[in-house]
Amino acid sequence: MGQCLSGNQVAGVANNGGEQPSGSNILRLPKLYTPNPLLTKEEVEVRRNEFWETCWAYGGSKEIWDVLHKVVTLLYEGNAEAATEMALAADLTIPENDISKGVYDSKGTFYEIPKIVARIPRAFAERKDSLDDEDDNMISSNDPTKSPEEHDTTTKSIASLKDAELDSSLETVLIRYSKDDKDYSIQINPNLPFSHAKSQLEEVGLENVQRFFFLGRVLQFKKSLSQQGWTSGMIIQAM
């Protein structure tokens, strides 16, 4: 993750005796974005917390990660000037003054902050709606007025959908192992539970890995990669 200001801009501020940066050098407030799929406010908060709790696993300095956490918090609060001053004090470089573009520390190490942390969702999913839908589906499936044939049709439709997911082609998943800083490639179906990747992990020598991280949170073996937000090209961290 990097600095908000260019080297010349940082030098200019220093030459002004530590005066506050001009308006053009102020960090931008978080932009809006549309998550896909939509998440509830609670889910967004959980993922953000998980990221800050595990961000050190992505490399870089823990001290810098702590500073970035404070900088992002200030930006959430609308205090761009204080966030900018903190970034300057830590000698960070932030491309285009946009924290979502990443940050570089004084040693040139890049720190990437995922959208869900660096930006603000344009909309949230409604937990109540999803629960109501589940209740409606349950009532419909238990409707005594439906004939066995109608129930069978519903069952077949669900089965067909599952078959389609299972038949989808395998995709390449890159896993970056923190112990040797190498990338390992496995071929798995992203629509199946991640636990199905056990044999592939053994083949590349990652059978002893205790935890896998993605977007700052621990991957769940009972869920598929697709369910956890993974798309082709994204890298999974292993520890």
UniProtKB/Swiss-Prot annotation:
Q: Which UniProt keywords apply?
A: Phosphoprotein
Q: Which residues carry this modification: Phosphoserine?
A: 160
**Tagged with keyword Transport:** no
A UniProt-annotated Pfam family: UBD
Which domain of life does this protein belong to? Eukaryota
Disordered: where is this region?
129-155
Q: Does the keyword RNA-binding apply?
A: no
Q: Where are the transmembrane segments?
A: none
Gene3D superfamilies referenced in this protein's UniProt entry, alphabetically: Ub domain-containing protein, DC-UbP/UBTD2, N-terminal domain
- What is the name listed in the Swiss-Prot or TrEMBL entry for this protein? Uncharacterized protein PB2B4.07
Q: Which organism is it from?
A: Schizosaccharomyces pombe (strain 972 / ATCC 24843) (Fission yeast)
Q: What high-level taxonomic lineage is stated for the organism?
A: Eukaryota, Fungi, Dikarya, Ascomycota, Taphrinomycotina
